[in-house]
């Protein structure tokens, strides 16, 4: 594991001061009432396993700008941050209720594409996703 100060963050992710401490942030519209600083919004490592991994210095396979297939998007909190610093982001979720929230999150993100599909059955959504996905989360 790498010390936080040595961590190379994906392009489009920065450390910014929120509530008196340095935390991860992405540029984008607020989704869940998270603290903001101008265009930047806090990415809470206590609410997002992916943010916790990045915060801990683990390699997550995201550099910024890539095409992402995000499996298990739920209501869209973490995937909204991913879409803020990535290219096309396909968010797969099988439960209709969270997908309603996910669709609302996608309204402010032109590169976020919610898919009401079962992630275990890629043949049902492969025709929608770009052929060359750079990362699967």
Which ranges hold each PLM region?
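N-terminal auxiliary segments of SAM/dcSAM-dependent transferases
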Residues: 1-40
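Signal for well-folded cores of large energy- and translation-related assemblies
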Residues: 55-59, 83, 103, 107
């Amino acid at each position: 594991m790498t010390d936080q100060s040595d961590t190379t963050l994906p392009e489009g992710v920065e450390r910014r001061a929120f509530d008196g401490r340095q935390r991860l942030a992405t540029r984008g519209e607020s989704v869940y009432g998270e603290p903001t600083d101008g265009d930047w919004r806090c990415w809470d490592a206590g609410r997002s396993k992916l943010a916790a991994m990045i915060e801990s210095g683990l390699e997550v396979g995201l550099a910024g700008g890539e095409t992402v297939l995000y499996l298990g998007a739920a209501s869209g909190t973490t995937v909204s941050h991913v879409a803020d610093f990535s290219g096309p982001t396909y968010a797969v979720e099988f439960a209709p209720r969270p997908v309603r929230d996910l669709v609302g999150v996608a309204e402010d993100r032109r590169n976020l594409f919610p898919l009401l599909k079962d992630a275990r059955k890629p043949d049902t959504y492969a025709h929608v996703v770009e052929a060359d996905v750079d990362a699967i989360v």
